[in-house]
Amino acid sequence: MSMLKPSGLKAPTKILKPGSTALKTPAAAAAPLEKTVPSEKASGPPSSETQEEFVDDFRVGERVWVNGNKPGFIQFLGETQFAPGQWAGIVLDEPIGKNDGSVAGVRYFQCEPLKGIFTRPSKLTRKVQAEDEANGLQTAHARAASPLSTAAATMVSSSPATPSNIPQKPSQPVAKETSATPQISNLTKTASESISNLSEAGSVKKGERELKIGDRVLVGGTKAGVVRFLGETDFAKGEWCGVELDEPLGKNDGAVAGTRYFQCQPKYGLFAPVHKVTKIGFPSTTPAKAKAAAVRRVMATTPASLKRSPSASSLSSMSSVASSVSSKPSRTGLLTETSSRYARKISGTTALQEALKEKQQHIEQLLAERDLERAEVAKATSHVGEIEQELALARDGHDQHVLELEAKMDQLRTMVEAADREKVELLNQLEEEKRKVEDLQFRVEEESITKGDLETQTKLEHARIKELEQSLLFEKTKADKLQRELEDTRVATVSEKSRIMELEKDLALRVQEVAELRRRLESSKPPGDVDMSLSLLQEISALQEKLEVTHTDHQNEVTSLKDHFGTREEMFQKEIKALHAATEKLSKENESLRSKLDHANKENSDVIALWKSKLETAIASHQQAMEELKVSFSKGIGTDSAEFAELKTQIERLRLDYQHEIESLQSKQDSERSAHAKEMESMKAKLMKIIKEKEDSLEAVKARLDTAEDQHLVEMEEMLSKLQEAEIKKEKFASASEEAVSTQTSMQDTVNKLHQKEEQFNMLSSELEKLRENLTDMEAKFKEKDEREDQLVKAKEKLENDIAEIMKMSGDNSSQLTKMNDELRLKERSVEELQLKLTKANENASLLQKSIGEVTLKAEQSQQEAAKKHEEEKKELENKLLELEKKMETSHYQCQDLKAKYEKASSETKIKHEEILQNFQKMLVDTEDKLKAAQEANRDLMQDMEELKSQADKAKAAQTAEDAMQIMEQMTKEKTETLASLEDTKQTNAKLQSELDTLKENNLKTVEELNKSKELLNEENQKMEEFKKEIETLKQAAAQKSQQLSALQEENVKLAEELGRTRDEVTSHQKLEEERSVLNNQLLEMKKSLPSNTLRESEYRKDADEEKASLQKSISLTSALLTEKDAELEKLRNEVTVLRGENASAKSLHSVVQTLESDKVKLELKVKNLELQLKENKRQLSSSSGNTDVQTEEDERAQESQQMIDFLNSVIVDLQRKNQDLKMKVEMMSEAALNGNGEDPNSYDSDDQEKQSKKKPRLFCDICDCFDLHDTEDCPTQAQMSEDPPHSTHHGSRSEERPYCEICEMFGHWATNCNDDETF
């Protein structure tokens, strides 16, 4: 039992077995032959029944057969732990199982040891299968009959057939032979497996080719799913099948090692080799009927079947009989000859007499031939009887010899069967080992796939770690910057605090000075200086007020600074905390990822080591098994060869004995033949006498037949003329149908042409769509340019406003004016550079427009040409349609005429047939009346006879005996005449009835022909209707094509309008640029006439800086656009060069393809020759003697040829793959050339160009060496802090007065709102 492995994978396909040499047995009895044929016939139906029963639901307790030969009861149904999928546990009748209901420590049911077995439900059947399926060959339904199997068939079928006349011997040897036949069939099956497996592999390959995307399949026999991918992959060589499973039992989501082959949910995708995948509802092999038929053919064509004929003499006699039968002239030929002669000579009595003479001659010839045939048949029958008696005697001796030989053969068979069983068991073990190795290889492949997935995951994780490290570095740089800023702010706060302290000290000193001054004033105050003191007091109060205001302002500024610094410090601290947390998280993630990586690497290494050890153990066990098998094979071959030699010597002796016996029998047969020939001559003489007597009676019948035949011939000639007319009409009808077929083919051609035109239209429409897309891209670019122009216009307006304000507020500073002039010159240079770049961009745009115009012109021309061609073809089609319609009408009228004529002819034939029948019926009635009259006359005569007898009795006394005798003789003569007339009438009646039967048959034939012609007419009518429908569909298609043409023309017009608009936009763009140059000139003139102004310098500088920034932005935008356009141009040039190279390579590839195809043909011829050699070698093997040296040499030759065939097949497969790849490349190149119309090299592969132009390039930083985060220009590591502080831009209105505190000396609040409460 071949159980599935725990991986749930399907067991590998059958491996080729070494062919065992078949025995040649002597002729056996006929009974085994009769039994082998039904067994072969019976091998067909069970295969289909089992295929149906795979789907059936089995039940627990149901009686089944495992593999068709192990009976038992189902005890368990369901899933198991040792392997996935549904399993059936069976309790067998005999202890030939594997377990007692438990596997790997888990019990599923209870039974006796070695009676339990687990198998798939598909291996169970409800009926006993044939012996070849029971031996484990139920998978090979479609194996061809190999030479070895033919040799086995000759062994079985070589017994001579017993004729039915001879009594057979007792049935003991027959029983022995019946028991021996299945053993021989087993031998032949084991021998033929090596060749039948080749055909099985071929059938599997066919099944693989029939796999398509979307098919329902089984992977490993258990995992069901849908095919989503078919082809070669990057992770492994060969053809792979990607399957989306119904359940999450897979390995991936359609992607392996970073490359995606199809899309599905995780754990639902699985990749497997094509030979491991089976299509649901598609049998991999053909049914077993082919094998049975092949065996029957071989049995029919074997040379042993020729030996069944008892002797060569019987064959010669049979050939003589066949020759005599073939030499007999036909009745129909004679009738035709006589009819032709009578047709020529109907008029006159002389013609009738000549015809009578000719008929008499014909009858004499026929009678002579009949005599010869009868003599030959009599000879043959007597000869056959004698030969059969001799054969019976020979068979008695032969049966004794056969019984002795069969006893010896039985002993040899038992020995051979034992050896074969051991071989079969060893081969099964070998197959199981090979299956295990294949399973291990498949698992290794799966592990390699999973390893590839793990490697991709590790690569992704490494990339993520790198990105995280880069982000860490970025965050660290940010943190450093923030710390530096904090330190700077702290230094600034310290300096400001020291300044505040100094100001406070100054205040204190000033207050002291004021107090001292007051004291001095009070002390030095004279009485007359009151006014001075008052003024001084007023000044002091004013100074004090100023001091208080300045103090309050200063306090406000200090508080605001403190608040600002506090908030800044809090912000910085928060940012630092967040950065620390992020760095901690990143470090933790990094550590976890590294641990995962280490763990995955360890697991991978463990798994690889495990599989390596398993593989090594499996290979070692496999090698041991192979060595043991080789040893056992060498021993078995030695013993078998000795036995075969002994058998051959015995068989040759028996053959010599048989030859002597046959020679003696032939000499006896020759002597008996001469005696038989003499007897036959005497018999012929007697027959001649009898024939002469019967000729007299035949002449009377001939006269009556002639008249009837003349009438019949006339009627037949009339019927023949009518039939000829009908045949002529049929021929006309057939010619009409042929014309219809030719029109249909022409219609199909036109339809094909239409399809081609549709494809051309589709190509043109795709090109138009591409042009539209290019136009939309150009429009988008033009829109961007318009937006930039709008920005420039706005900037120009701002500059004009600023210039107007500067003109109003101009001052006297000449130095500042010179500076401004210098800056303006610099700006002018930059503007000139921008203008140069713009001119270049405009030139590029004009070039693009020209290329677009050329493309559109080409498209329009091609469209117009296609439209013209389409219209011409349309006209041709319409003309053809009109002609077809005319032909159809004429054929329709001809059909109607033929129908009418046919109906008339049929009615006439019916009427004539009825008339002939009536005449014959009248004739029959007349003959019956005549018969009755003759019978009545006979009765009267009998009565007269009786009366005469009575009169004779009475007259005996009166008259003499002589008178009575005369009367009696007269009466007997009359009686014989009446009897002869009765027989004549009976014969004529029988002839008339036979003629009636022939007429009825002819009538039936004519009726059948009528029906056939009617059916033909109906079929022709149906074809005519189909033609009409096709014509209508073609008309509709033509209308659709014309609509499509008109739509395409409209779209072309629209495209032309859009081109015109784009050209108008370009001209407007050029006008705007001219206006800009004019405005720049005006600016220069305005700058020359600018007066100096000192107050507004700072504002002017700010405005100039703003202008600078906006101009720099516009310059950067234009430069980016220019670089993009340059890159696009370079790409286009590169693509053109690549396409030219590909075109050259395509030509070289085409030549390579041709050479490869020629090599392939040569290799295929070599393969065929080698296969023929293999077949011849195998035939020689099967028919050769038991010499071990010759056998070993032939085996080595067969193996070498097989290896050569395998090698050549692999070479052919590789060549086919290369050929397909090259063809694909050539097709791609030809499609690219077709898309470009073969004129413009830039137009090749426009689809790829569009895709490339549409695809945005991924962001990549050359500094950080990472994708998708940022560009090198936007990298934060290369961003530097500006040395000069930025200009303050308040964007307030110039008329408004900003609030200023004199105490704090800061903007933002007034002195009245300043806080005086703050302490310093």
From Swiss-Prot:
Query: Would you tell me the protein name for this molecule?
Result: CAP-Gly domain-containing linker protein 1
Q: Assembly and partners?
A: Interacts with MTOR; phosphorylates and regulates CLIP1. Interacts (via CAP-Gly domains) with tubulin and TUBA1B. Interacts with SLAIN2. Interacts with MAPRE1 and MAPRE3. Interacts (via zinc finger) with DCTN1. Binds preferentially to tyrosinated microtubules, and only marginally to detyrosinated microtubules.
Important for tubulin binding: region residues: 97-101
Q: Which residues carry this modification: Phosphothreonine?
A: 50, 181
Q: Where are the zinc fingers (CCHC-type)?
A: 1299-1316
Superkingdom assignment: Eukaryota
What does the UniProt PTM comment say about this protein? Phosphorylated. Phosphorylation induces conformational changes by increasing the affinity of the N-terminus for C-terminus, resulting in inhibition of its function thus decreasing its binding to microtubules and DCTN1. Exhibits a folded, autoinhibited conformation when phosphorylated and an open conformation when dephosphorylated with increased binding affinity to microtubules and DCTN1. Phosphorylation regulates its recruitment to tyrosinated microtubules and the recruitment of vesicular cargo to microtubules in neurons.
What GO cellular component entries does it have? cell cortex; centrosome; cytoplasmic microtubule; cytoplasmic vesicle membrane; macropinosome; microtubule; microtubule cytoskeleton; microtubule plus-end
Q: Where is the composition biased (Basic and acidic residues)?
A: 1096-1109
Could you give the domain comment from the record? Intramolecular interaction between the zinc finger domain and the CAP-Gly domains may inhibit interaction with tubulin.
List the biased-composition ranges (Polar residues).
156-171, 1180-1190
Q: Which UniProt keywords apply?
A: Cell projection, Coiled coil, Cytoplasm, Cytoplasmic vesicle, Cytoskeleton, Membrane, Metal-binding, Microtubule, Phosphoprotein, Repeat, Transport, Zinc, Zinc-finger
Region Disordered, as annotated, extends over 1-53, 156-181, 301-338, 1089-1109, 1178-1201
Q: Per its UniProt record, what PANTHER family does this chain match? A: CAP-GLY DOMAIN-CONTAINING LINKER PROTEIN 1 (PTHR18916:SF44), DYNACTIN 1-RELATED MICROTUBULE-BINDING (PTHR18916)
Its function, per the record, reads: Binds to the plus end of microtubules and regulates the dynamics of the microtubule cytoskeleton. Promotes microtubule growth and microtubule bundling. Links cytoplasmic vesicles to microtubules and thereby plays an important role in intracellular vesicle trafficking. Plays a role macropinocytosis and endosome trafficking.
Localization, per the record, is: Cytoplasm; Cytoplasm, Cytoskeleton; Cytoplasmic vesicle membrane; Cell projection, Ruffle
Q: Which GO terms describe its molecular function?
A: microtubule binding; microtubule plus-end binding; tubulin binding; zinc ion binding
Record membrane topology: Peripheral membrane protein
Q: Does the keyword field hold DNA-binding?
A: no
- Bias class Low complexity marks the residues at 21-35, 301-331
Ranges where the CAP-Gly domain occurs = 78-120, 231-273
Which residues get modified to Phosphoserine?
48, 146, 194, 196, 199, 203, 309, 311, 314, 347, 1116, 1246
Instruction: Name one process (GO BP) from the record.
Output: cytoplasmic microtubule organization
